[in-house]
């Protein structure tokens, strides 16, 4: 029994240390990507993390669903270049605030016409809405191929890797990890080196900060 208890204690300690290390790395990724700004042609879409809780509301009203904006900068012919993700409520004010931070005035934003996306013009960007009508057919529209492919890959990766993390509390960090990796996918050699350098130069992150609901600057 002693051996069993001792092994359990070691396992709990190791899990806690692994969690802290993981979130320190996620925080570094978040800080590295926090100043990311997109320009040129940009596809945007509304997206959600999480699913229905047992006995909870279905669909977008689920208590476990977290909304976030997905934006993918592309070439003029639609090939993806960079991505920008942020947890937010789909209101015009929230999108306007995000646009001022994440879009250059030269951005040409393509959206599905959701009312809140009119807020992208707050950055000086131009907006070209295309009302899709929703449903399965809407994801096949060529104007949104890059962002739809990106979101499909993101959701598949999350479903296969993360099964029980707190979407509401830690979505910013996990989305930052996806963004960090995607934006460096064309030169994988810089991912580890850049992460080590950024981590070494960042200030210490005590556990209470890492467990806080919002990322710390």
Positions of PLM-derived features:
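Residue-level recognition of single "structural anchor" positions
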Residues: 1-217
């Amino acid at each position: 029994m002693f051996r069993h208890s001792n092994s359990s204690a070691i396992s709990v300690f190791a899990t806690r240390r692994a969690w802290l290390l993981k979130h320190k790395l996620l925080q570094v990724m978040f800080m590295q990507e926090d100043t990311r700004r997109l320009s040129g042609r940009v596809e945007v879409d509304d997206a959600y993390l999480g699913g229905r809780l047992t006995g909870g509301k279905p669909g977008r009203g689920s208590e476990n669903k977290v909304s976030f904006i997905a934006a993918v900068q592309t070439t003029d012919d639609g090939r993806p270049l960079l991505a920008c993700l942020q947890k937010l409520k789909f209101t015009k004010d929230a999108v306007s605030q995000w646009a001022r931070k994440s879009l250059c005035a030269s951005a040409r934003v393509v959206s599905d016409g959701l009312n809140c996306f009119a807020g992208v013009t707050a950055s000086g960007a131009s907006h070209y809405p295309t009302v899709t009508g929703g449903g399965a057919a809407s994801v096949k529209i060529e104007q949104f191929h890059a962002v739809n492919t990106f979101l499909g890959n993101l959701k598949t990766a999350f479903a296969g890797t993360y099964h029980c993390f707190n979407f509401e509390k830690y979505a910013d960090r996990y989305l930052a990890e996806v963004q960090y990796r995607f934006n460096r996918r064309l030169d994988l050699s810089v991912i580890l080196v850049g992460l080590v350098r950024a981590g070494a130069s960042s200030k210490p992150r005590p556990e209470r900060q890492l467990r806080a609901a919002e990322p710390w600057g």
